[in-house]
């Protein structure tokens, strides 16, 4: 889950 690190990316 990239959103967990980037938030939107």
Swiss-Prot record:
Top-level taxonomic group: Eukaryota
Entry annotated with the keyword DNA-binding: no
Biological process (GO), any one: neuropeptide signaling pathway
Tissue spec: Expressed in the CNS and midgut but not in the ring gland, thoracic perisympathetic organs (tPSO) and abdominal perisympathetic organs (aPSO) (at protein level).
Subcellular localization, as worded in the UniProt entry: Secreted
Keyword annotations of the record: Amidation, Neuropeptide, Secreted
Sites bearing Arginine amide, chain numbering: 9
GO cellular component terms listed in the entry, alphabetical order: extracellular region
Record flagged with keyword Metal-binding: no
Protein purpose: Myoactive peptide.
The protein, known as: Tachykinin-related peptide TPTAFYGVR-amide
Source organism: Delia radicum (Cabbage root fly)
Lineage, broadest ranks: Eukaryota, Metazoa, Ecdysozoa, Arthropoda, Hexapoda
